Every structure is written in structure tokens, then in C-alpha cells.
Amino acid sequence: VIIAMLFALMMIAKLFSIPTGFADLRISFTYVFFALIAMMYGPMTGLIIGLCSDTLGFFIFPNGASFFFPYTIQAAISGLIYGLCLYKKEVKLSNIFFTRLLINMIMNVIWGSLCFGWLYGYDFATTCAYMLTYSLPKNLLWLIPQTAVLYICLKAFTPIVKRFSN
């Protein structure tokens, strides 16, 4: 029941992203619920939630883009990373920073850029240019704010996590 409620909140949070004026750069708090689920129930649950949220999100909130399964893999592995880094661990700023660093750099910058290049048929040089000039700066810019928000939220939810996690 708790997973379903948090998953529903995660899906609702997808509706409330704030555009920044750049192409796909939006401020969203979906990752907070994603991390909370993985922190409470572990890496496999995080992986499954990633698969479900990306797939259901595509059908519930269509944005005109094509469904592209490698992005679903990105969401699933991100959930796995959240679970591996946060499950049954004390909420510490260094741990949250490391988790976000892994997700931002490996999943968002590297995997996300490769998916972007593959989806749009870009050659490797163009994909690398996108990675270095757009994806890397964007993810570095948001690393500290995402870490801070995630730390504050997970710290606030720690008593609930201790009560309801398995």
C-alpha cells in the first residue's frame, strides 16, 4: 500500500515540473519519491518502479515523443542505483551526493546522451558534442540543488521510513 501511494505521488509529481526556458530542462521533484521508495524497499523495488514509472508515464502523460525503451532502462537502472546506495543506510549528505553524482553523470549524462543520439540518429561526434555542451553542464548545475532537496526530504521522512520499510 505504501509503495502504491508513493508511486501515485511520483506520477502526480510528473505533472508539476517547471519549465526553465531550455529545451528539456525542467525542474521536477519526481526523483524525491523515486529515491524514497528505493530507500524504503530496496534496489529491486527501485528497478521495478523505474520500469513502471517510465512506461506508465509515457501512456498517462503523452508529450508527443515516441516511446523509446532505452530511456526505460535508464529509469530502471536509476532506481536500482537509488536502492543500492540508500536502502538500509543512514541518510547522510555525502551518501546522497554520491548517489545523485552516479545518477547524474552515468545515467543522465552518459546513458541519456547516448539514448538521445540513438533516438535522433546522430553520429557519435554529434552525440558527444551534445553530451559535453548540454547534458554535462545541465547535470552539474542541478547536482547540488538536487542533492540538497533530496537530503532535506529524506531526512524529514526518516521516522516514517523506519516505521514502514521492510
Residue ranges and their predicted role:
Residues V1-N166:
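Loop-helix junctions at membrane interfaces
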